[in-house]
């Protein structure tokens, strides 16, 4: 463990990587009992922490940390590790290793956001679902060069270890990042690439063309990810950024460890996502990035909108992802394209093709009238798509609707149905996108290939994770198979190879079987006769279906392989056909469409248009595709393409996967396991069972165990000796030879380590985990000691040298000092002075001579210097010019030398090519001669066949006579058959489904036992489901019949309304008129309310008792009123009561809002699911029960209110003592309340005076405790008295006819109360201030209660209307079960009246009360939105009903689906009804509160009368009272205005609701009509089908009599049966898909709120990610600036070079003239060479194609099963033969079609034997067609093929003679033989022509080669001359220098 200071280098990432030192100390000091602290198994959490309490009889009692006590077995208790192992970084170091220890270690680290943990030799990472600062640049720097044990676990550590291993071991490395989908593999892959691009940066740009390069190699490597993610990643159910393709990124390094280049291999892009997505998923990111409008110029260029919903291909699921900012991602993608060096044209092409794919989804086609042919439904979309692809829109539409098909010798247009065209468009869109993606990968690889020397690479693997969806198809099988192979690779590497290594090295080791072998599942998928093998085999048969594929799978594997199972049928889940047991779980697969996906066909006519597109990129994408036009033109290389084009998707996938596994096996792997912590993507949450499942599947525990038990580290003896000899050099004697193994043994024995931690093998020494790290530390310490000693020696030596210098300097100083002292002593001596004076004079004469001489020499030197300077300047100028000349000559010589070298190489290549071509010409010549012989043989055969055909013609004439008779006799029946065929074509699906079950049962006995069981299971399942649903319907009907007569009457009334729905418009107008005439409706509603109230009183006997109790309480209140004398105290209590009521009202309002939400949710569900109306059959009886429950709730509420009031009295008594403290709070409350009435300033002054008065009143409260108690009792009892108003209101409605509505009555009552209060306040001014606030509070409470009451009444009315509407819909589905029409009419009349009464009563409740304006506006808006949704749903329903007209038999299944939905919604209805009952209880509670508030007003009035005595004391407040009255009048007016506004808003909302009800009724009417129409059409279709069956039987009998074709009819039945089975499977899949979509929609609706919360979290993550991207963008911009500066420098250098070049050209004109001739000759030589190279490359291409096809033919010949296939393989050599055989095949097909028109399907099946021969000939023709170009080069093999062909012709002739016995077969074969004879004639003629042509070509090629030889000789001579001249120039330059 490192200290906090050492962790500081990691910056802000330190807390997320390792525990702090303080935390480690706390963990070590934490109390811990190793004997009692355990993990215990627990059902919910898997394992929990606990403490052992006792052990008895093999049982252990454990108390968990949560306080629960568990008693479990001994083996369910696991010991806990000491606290110091908490959050341990390497789980292999744990004391106790078991599942709970690993789980909790990961959980605790994850809770601390330490997402990386070592698990032995590999690393485990947990997806945090949030951004963490652990990938910053300082973290990268901190991990660089660190050993694994020196730094915390991290993906950077794994990457650095791989990098260091590559450098030290000189071995390729790979990093395998695996895990399930959504585990974080893609993010970790990007981090690995980021690390390598940072630490191995080259810092240099590649030398590319200007404008083509925008970044360094490391920038390009990093930028490849955003581009690939944009086009290859998408949102799935489990992952917002899921890689929908696999990629293996190889990063190549040079010898020094610097980046050299990189390349990317991709695997299996999920093409189907382009055109189809599930609801919770979306397509590839690029589509939504473009439509994000971040770059408006793209929107304009691509002719698209910014709304993805305008494009069906990309809007089938979700269109936005909270965690992804599509706008910013678009900028990153666009920048990546630029950085990766795409040209501007390529970039525009990428966007255009992407936009074209989006437009493809909008292409519409319709069926021509009276034809099945499809035609375009508008050309606007096609024009846009064609424009973007550089095509002609008319040609595109024509190619889609009328593709060209080759028939015989000609091309004909083929008609397409709408479905076929739609499928073709989808296939083209997927193909364009897939090919564009692969091209982008190839371009990226081309850009990343720097041509620098590279030695080793590190591969990073990122593939799609293991996927288990509700609907799993072929893509999921491929993905899961890849993960299975990788897991097997991991298991084999970790467990098998590791232990085999121990055995091989002779280490004592017991083999441990970890049970992790996945071979069974892998072999089941890929081995011969496995799933892929069977799939490819089925793709080879044209009539194969999904059903036949499934049957073969069952036959081959069901019951034979334990990993292959039959899926379980789960209600609500998509249909599955088989299940596989993978290592990560059981996956159910649906095989629908697998054959088409595997074959991946395309419209060849459209492909031909693509190849001619003006968009070069599109033409390039499809340049290698083979089309029909290309075949017609005889394009060369067509044979190769045709021979290799039929490669299935699964075969290509397996080939790529095998290459990947080969690459991985050749590297040293490093494993990173990614874990999903939870399914909800919640940060910090971990689901124990989910994580444990992944740990078990990934072999984490086993990997830790093998790491702990085994010896994961190993090193060769010689390397060990060399590296660790320094630990103890004395252990290895010097000067004598010693074996490396013995030296290693001695060395290890002499070191102080645990000797059980290593073993000696034959060639290596093996170490336990951690020991090698310990040795490294010891080595580092030893090296540190040695270096320290060396440094000490060096420092000592340097010090001694310095000391010696100091000694020498001191001796020199002593000598100088001695001489100076001696001089000082003698310098004043007289003789010395004389000596000083004379000595200079002695040399003066000589000095003068020397000076004169020196002056002369100086002058000469000066002159010479001037001359030399002038000369030097001349030489310098000349040197500069010569240097320029030299440089230019050097450049020229260098270019000439390079040109000479190139010319020499090309000459050598030409010579070699010449030799090769000569040999090839000889071979071709020989083959041409053989071809001539073959042609002669073919001519003889042709004559022989002509004789045979003449005989066959005679037979044909006889057959024609017979057929003419037959046709005359069946002419009458033929017309009937045609009519029936036309009708059955229109009803193809219906007839197929009706006859399918019968045919399936008839033919089931001819199937194997498994097929029989499968069919019976299907039939039984459907029958049981249908029976069960019918039984459920019967039970529901029985239960409804047992209900009360009232409910039956109401249901009959609703059934009657079905007939009346046709007059719905008139009823809606009547209802609207009634609403507009408010007075008339109010009177009616008052009468109906009286009826309802009387009914309620009859049904609620206990309610009467409650009213009696209310009256008693009222009498008691009257007695208490007389005793109230102290009103001043009542103010405080009233305020307290007000606050309590306010809180209660808030609670009620919250519940009302929740109830309103539930109500709106119920209405929304009713509108969105019209079928759910039938689920509400019991609604009205629940409404009646609701009244009974309301009565009981009232009784309970009364008792609760009494108890509550008692509790309030006690509370108030206790509160009394605290009134002094609460005085200030009351003052603030008074201020707040007054501020709501008038301005703050006026209210403040009044309330201050009132507060002073209240303070006086509070002082008096102490002496009036009893009076306060009575007052409290009075106030609390008022609620009981107000409850009596409920009964009184019903009577008041009859008594007060003058009242217009309940709202006006309340208004008048409030007005009277206000006026009375005004009079009382004028008379009683003293009491006014005390009561004014109480009055205001009471009125406010009344308003709130009234509003809540109104809301409850409105909610109740809405529920009643919704229930009535629902029941009316429910009744519609019951009409077909009613038989007694007359009785139903009478009952419906009575029930209609009752229902109208109840409807009017409900409307009266709505109109009688006010509602909050804001709430109604929101409700109105919400209802409008819901109605719009309902209209959309109705349109979809109508479409579904129209589809039902074509799918009569499917009606029962749809009915079962609706019944299932009925059960689900019925449960929801019950829940809603429970809520309605609770709301009813709350409703009565609100009514009582409202009445209590009114009673409080009356009580206050009486109290004001009692306070008249105090008027004299309050006279001084009269003026204030007047102001208060004025304020109250304003409040009154304001309240009245608000009431009028609310009433108007209510009326508008009510009108809106009634309008919506009218819409719903109209919809119901239309639905009922549609359903009745469906029933009628079903009956008609049944009759038509019966008639068709009878006619068909007669026709078949007639034809059997005339043609004796019973066998053919039986075969026809077999074919129809298979077709019916396929249709049945398709309909079952559609039904299951519909069920799944419905269930998914319901789940999405319920989970919306949770998703919104998750969205906020994702938004936060996205914001943080955006900040990261901004930082990265800034860094990229800085890099770009640096690159721009470098570019400018290069440009300056280039300009300078250009100027130098121009100067050199001027100075070297003479030299240019001499070299010009050489240039001219060289140029001509180069042109000649290029021409030769072109010719040779063409020849080489043709030779390579021929050789390749020869190898293919040899392989196919070995694999051939039948003689026909063998013959087909060997006849590929005959080009012309195959072309004419193709035309013959097409003619034969046309002939077959003509015969099919004259004969029915039975006759066609009778000719099945002939069709087999046709199929063989067709296969032979197709294969012959692919080998056209190889004819001339494989003549020897052609002879053998012709001989076999002769044998085959004899066999065919013999077969023909046998077929003559059968008239119909003979007719078909005769026609084919005629066509074949004609074809052979043309074939022989054209073969002769082709042979002559080829001979002429060969002679021409020989002549050209001779000329090439001459040119090569000339070139050689010219090269020699150039060499001589270059040497002369070079010698001249050297001599000049």
UniProtKB/Swiss-Prot annotation:
Annotated Pfam families: Myosin_head, Myosin_N, Myosin_tail_1
Signal peptide (UniProt feature, chain positions): none
Places the protein is found: Cytoplasm, Myofibril
Ranges of residues in domain Myosin N-terminal SH3-like: 33-82
Binding site for ATP: 179-186
Pros-methylhistidine modified-residue sites: 755
One MF annotation (Gene Ontology) recorded for this entry: actin filament binding
Residues modified as Phosphothreonine: 64, 69, 417, 1239, 1253, 1284, 1465, 1499, 1515, 1728, 1734
Stretch list, region Disordered: 1124-1145, 1151-1170, 1883-1913
Phosphoserine modifications at: 623, 1094, 1160, 1235, 1241, 1259, 1290, 1301, 1304, 1472, 1493, 1512, 1540, 1552, 1572, 1712, 1724, 1737
Positions of the IQ domain: 783-812
Function summary: Myosins are actin-based motor molecules with ATPase activity essential for muscle contraction.
The protein's name: Myosin-2
Organism the protein comes from: Equus caballus
């Amino acid at each position: 463990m490192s200290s906090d200071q050492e962790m500081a280098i990691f910056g802000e990432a330190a807390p997320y990587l390792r525990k702090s030192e303080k935390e480690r100390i706390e963990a070590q000091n934490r109390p811990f009992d190793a004997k009692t602290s355990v993990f215990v198994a627990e059902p919910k959490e898997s394992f929990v922490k606990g403490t052992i309490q006792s052990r008895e009889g093999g049982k252990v009692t454990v108390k968990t940390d949560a306080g629960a006590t568990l008693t479990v077995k001994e083996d369910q208790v696991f010991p806990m590790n000491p606290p110091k192992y908490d959050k341990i970084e390497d789980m292999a170091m744990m004391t106790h290793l078991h599942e709970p220890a690993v789980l909790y270690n990961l959980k605790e680290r994850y809770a601390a956001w330490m997402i990386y943990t070592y698990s032995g030799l590999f690393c485990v990472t947990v997806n945090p679902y949030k951004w963490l600062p652990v990938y910053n640049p300082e973290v990268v720097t901190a991990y660089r060069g660190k050993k694994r044990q020196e730094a915390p676990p991290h993906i950077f550590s794994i990457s650095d270890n791989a990098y260091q291993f590559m450098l030290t071991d000189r071995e390729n490395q790979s990093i395998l990042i695996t895990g399930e989908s959504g585990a974080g593999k893609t993010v970790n892959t990007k981090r690995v690439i980021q690390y390598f691009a940072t630490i191995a940066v080259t810092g240099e740009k590649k030398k590319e063309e200007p404008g083509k390069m925008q970044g360094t190699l490391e920038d390009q490597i990093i930028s490849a990810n955003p581009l690939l993610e944009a086009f290859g990643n998408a949102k799935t159910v489990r992952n917002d950024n899921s890689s929908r393709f696999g990629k293996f990124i190889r990063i190549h390094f040079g010898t020094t460890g610097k980046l050299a280049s990189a390349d990317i291999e991709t695997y299996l892009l999920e093409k189907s996502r382009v055109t189809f997505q599930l609801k919770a998923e979306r397509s590839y990111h690029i589509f939504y990035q473009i439509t994000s409008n971040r770059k408006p110029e793209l929107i304009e260029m691509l002719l698209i909108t910014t709304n993805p919903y305008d494009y069906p291909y990309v809007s089938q699921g979700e269109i936005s992802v909270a965690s992804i900012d599509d706008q910013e991602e678009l900028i990153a993608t666009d920048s990546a394209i630029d950085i990766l060096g795409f040209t501007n044209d390529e970039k525009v092409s990428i966007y255009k093709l992407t936009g074209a794919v989006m437009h493809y989804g909008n292409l519409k086609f319709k069926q021509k009238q009276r034809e099945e042919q499809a035609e375009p439904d508008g050309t606007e979309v096609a024009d846009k798509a064609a424009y973007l692809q550089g095509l002609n829109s008319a040609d595109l539409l024509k190619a889609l609707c009328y593709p060209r098909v080759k028939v015989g010798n000609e091309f004909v247009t083929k008609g397409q149905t709408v479905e076929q065209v739609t499928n073709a468009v989808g296939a083209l869109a997927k193909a364009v996108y897939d090919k564009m993606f692969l091209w982008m990968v190839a371009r990226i690889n081309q850009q990343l290939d720097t041509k620098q020397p590279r030695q080793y690479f590190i591969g990073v693997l990122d593939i799609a994770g293991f996927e288990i969806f509700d609907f799993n198809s072929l893509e999921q099988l491929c993905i899961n198979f890849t993960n299975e192979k990788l897991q097997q690779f991991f298991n084999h590497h970790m467990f098998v190879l590791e232990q085999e290594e121990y055995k091989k090295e002779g280490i004592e080791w017991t083999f441990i079987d970890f049970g992790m072998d996945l071979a069974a599942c892998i072999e089941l998928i890929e081995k011969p006769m496995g799933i892929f093998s069977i799939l490819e085999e089925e793709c080879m048969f044209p009539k194969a279906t999904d059903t036949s594929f499934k049957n073969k799978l069952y036959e081959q594997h069901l019951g034979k392989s334990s990993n292959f199972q039959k899926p379980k049928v789960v209600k609500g889940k998509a249909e599955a056909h088989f299940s596989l047991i993978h290592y990560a779980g059981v996956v159910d697969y649906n095989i629908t469409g697998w054959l088409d996906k595997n074959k991946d066909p395309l419209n060849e006519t459209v492909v031909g248009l693509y190849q001619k597109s003006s968009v070069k990129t599109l033409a390039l994408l499809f340049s290698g595709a083979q089309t029909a036009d290309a075949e017609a033109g005889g394009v060369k290389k067509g044979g190769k393409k045709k021979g290799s084009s039929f490669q299935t998707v699964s075969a290509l996938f397996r080939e790529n996967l095998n290459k990947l596994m080969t690459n991985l096996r050749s590297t040293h792997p490093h494993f990173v396991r990614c874990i999903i912590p939870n399914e909800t993507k919640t940060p910090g949450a971990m689901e124990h069972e989910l994580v444990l499942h992944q740990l078990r599947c990934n072999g984490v525990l086993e990997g830790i165990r093998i790491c702990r038990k085994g010896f994961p580290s190993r090193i060769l003896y010689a390397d060990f000796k060399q590296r660790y000899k320094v630990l103890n050099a004395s252990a290895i004697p010097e000067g004598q030879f010693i074996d490396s193994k013995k030296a290693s043994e001695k060395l290890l024995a002499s070191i102080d380590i645990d000797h059980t931690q290593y073993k000696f093998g034959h060639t290596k020494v093996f170490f336990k985990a951690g020991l090698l790290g310990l040795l490294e530390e010891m080595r580092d310490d030893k090296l540190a000691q040695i270096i320290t000693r060396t440094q000490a020696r060096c420092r000592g030596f340097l010090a001694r040298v310095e000391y010696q210098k100091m000694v020498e300097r001191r001796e020199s100083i002593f000598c100088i000092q001695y001489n100076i002292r001696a001089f000082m002593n003698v310098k004043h001596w007289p003789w010395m002075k004389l000596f000083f004076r004379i000595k200079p004079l002695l040399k003066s004469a000589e000095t003068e001579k020397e000076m004169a001489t020196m002056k002369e020499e100086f002058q000469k030197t000066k002159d010479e210097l001037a001359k030399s300077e002038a000369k030097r300047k001349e030489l310098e100028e000349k040197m500069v010019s010569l240097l320029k000349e030299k440089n230019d000559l050097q450049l020229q010589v260098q270019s000439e030398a390079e040109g000479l070298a190139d010319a020499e190489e090309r000459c050598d290549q030409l010579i070699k090519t010449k030799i090769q071509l000569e040999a090839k010409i000889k071979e071709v010549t020989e083959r041409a001669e053989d071809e001539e012989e073959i042609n002669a043989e073919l001519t003889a055969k042709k004559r022989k066949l002509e004789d045979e055909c003449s005989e066959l013609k005679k037979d044909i004439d006889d057959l024609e006579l017979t057929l003419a008779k037959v046709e005359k006799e069946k002419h009458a029946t033929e017309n009937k058959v045609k009519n029936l065929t036309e009708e059955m074509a229109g009803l193809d699906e219906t007839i197929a489904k009706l006859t399918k079950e019968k045919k399936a049962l008839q033919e089931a006995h001819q199937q194997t036992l498994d097929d029989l069981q499968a069919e019976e299971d299907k039939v039984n399942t459907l029958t049981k489901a249908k029976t069960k649903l019918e039984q459920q319907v019967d039970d529901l009907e029985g239960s409804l019949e047992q209900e009360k007569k009232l409910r039956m009457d109401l249901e009959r009334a609703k059934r009657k309304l079905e007939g009346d729905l046709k007059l719905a418009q008139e009823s809606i107008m009547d209802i609207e008129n009634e609403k507009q005439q408010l007075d008339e409706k109010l009177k009616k509603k008052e009468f109906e309310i009286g009826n309802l109230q009387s009914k309620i009183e009859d049904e609620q006997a206990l309610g009467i008792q409650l009213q009696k109790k209310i009256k008693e309480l009222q009498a008691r209140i009257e007695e208490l009123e007389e005793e109230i004398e102290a009103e001043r105290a009542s103010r405080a209590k009233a305020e307290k009561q007000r606050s309590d009521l306010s809180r209660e009202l808030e609670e009620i309002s919250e519940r009302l809002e929740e109830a309103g939400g539930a109500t709106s949710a119920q209405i929304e569900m009713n509108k969105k699911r019209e079928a759910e109306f039938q689920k509400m059959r019991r609604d009205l009886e629940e409404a009646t029960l609701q009244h009974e429950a309301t009565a009981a709730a009232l009784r309970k509420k009364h008792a609760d209110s009494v108890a509550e009031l008692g509790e309030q009295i006690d509370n108030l008594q206790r509160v009394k003592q605290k009134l002094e403290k609460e005085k200030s709070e009351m003052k603030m409350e008074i201020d707040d309340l007054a501020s709501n009435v008038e301005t703050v300033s006026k209210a403040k002054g009044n309330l201050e005076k009132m507060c002073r008065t209240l303070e006086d009143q509070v002082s008096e409260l102490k002496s009036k405790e009893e009076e306060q108690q009575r007052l409290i009792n009075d106030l609390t009892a008022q609620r009981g008295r107000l409850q009596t108003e409920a009964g009184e209101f019903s009577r008041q409605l009859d008594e007060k006819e003058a009242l217009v509505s309940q709202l006006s009555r309340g208004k008048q009552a409030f007005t009277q109360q206000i006026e009375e209060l005004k009079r009382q306040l004028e008379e009683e001014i003293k009491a006014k201030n005390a009561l004014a606030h109480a009055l205001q509070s009471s009125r406010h409470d009344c308003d709130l209660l009234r509003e809540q009451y109104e809301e409850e009444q409105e909610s109740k009315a809405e529920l009643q209307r919704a229930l009535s509407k629902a029941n009316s819909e429910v009744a519609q589905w019951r009409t077909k079960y009613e038989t007694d029409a007359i009785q139903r009419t009478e009952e419906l009349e009575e029930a209609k009246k009752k229902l109208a009464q109840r409807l009017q009563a409900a409307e009266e409740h709505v109109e009688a009360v006010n509602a909050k304006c804001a709430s109604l506006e929101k409700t109105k808006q919400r209802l409008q939105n819901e109605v719009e949704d309902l209209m959309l749903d109705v349109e979809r329903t109508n479409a579904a009903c129209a589809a039902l007209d074509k799918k009569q038999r499917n009606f029962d299944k749809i009915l079962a689906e609706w019944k299932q939905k009925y059960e689900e919604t019925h449960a929801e209805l019950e829940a809603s009804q429970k809520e309605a009952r609770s709301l009813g209880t709350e409703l009565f509670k609100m009514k009582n509160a409202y009445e209590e508030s009114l009673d409080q007003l009356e009580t206050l009035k009486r109290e004001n009368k009692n306070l008249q005595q105090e008027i004299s004391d309050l006279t001084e407040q009269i003026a204030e009272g007047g102001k208060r009255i004025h304020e109250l009048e304003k409040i009154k007016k304001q309240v009245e205005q608000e009431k009028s506004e609310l009433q108007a808003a209510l009326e508008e909302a009510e009108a809106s609701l009634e309008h919506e009800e009218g819409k719903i009724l109209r919809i119901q009417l239309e639905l009922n009509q549609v359903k009745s129409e469906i029933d009628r059409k079903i009956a008609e279709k049944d009759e038509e089908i019966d008639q068709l069956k009878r006619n068909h039987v007669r026709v078949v009998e007639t034809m059997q009599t005339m043609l004796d074709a019973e066998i053919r009819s039986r075969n026809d039945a077999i074919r129809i049966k298979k077709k019916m089975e396929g249709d049945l499977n398709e309909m079952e899949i559609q039904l299951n898909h519909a069920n799944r979509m419905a269930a998914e929609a319901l789940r999405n609706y319920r989970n919306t709120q949770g998703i919104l919360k998750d969205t906020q979290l994702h938004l936060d993550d996205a914001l943080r990610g955006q900040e990261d991207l901004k930082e990265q963008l800034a860094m990229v911009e800085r890099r770009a600036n640096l690159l721009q500066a470098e570019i400018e420098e290069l440009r300056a250098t280039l300009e300078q070079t250009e100027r130098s070049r121009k100067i050199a050209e001027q100075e070297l004109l003479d030299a240019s003239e001499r070299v010009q001739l050489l240039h001219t000759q060289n140029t001509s030589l180069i042109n000649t060479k290029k021409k030769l190279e072109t010719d040779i490359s063409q020849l080489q291409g043709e030779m390579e194609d021929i050789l390749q096809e020869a190898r293919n033919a040899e392989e196919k010949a070995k694999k051939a099963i039948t003689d026909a296939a063998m013959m087909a393989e060997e006849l590929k050599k005959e080009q012309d033969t195959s072309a004419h055989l193709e035309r013959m095949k097409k003619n034969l097909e046309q002939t077959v079609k003509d015969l099919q028109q004259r004969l029915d399907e039975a006759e066609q099946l009778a000719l099945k034997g002939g069709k087999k021969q046709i199929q063989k000939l067709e296969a032979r023709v197709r294969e012959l067609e692919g080998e056209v170009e190889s004819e001339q080069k494989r003549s020897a093999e052609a002879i053998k093929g012709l001989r076999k062909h002769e044998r085959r012709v004899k066999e065919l002739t013999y077969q023909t003679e046998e077929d003559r016995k059968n008239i119909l077969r003979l007719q078909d074969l005769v026609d084919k033989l005629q066509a074949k004879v004609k074809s052979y004639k043309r074939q022989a003629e054209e073969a002769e022509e082709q042979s002559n042509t080829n001979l002429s070509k060969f002679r021409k090629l020989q002549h050209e080669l001779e000329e090439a030889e001459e040119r090569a000789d000339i070139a050689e001579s010219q090269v020699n001359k150039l060499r001589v001249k270059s040497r002369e120039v070079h010698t001249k330059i050297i001599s000049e220098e």
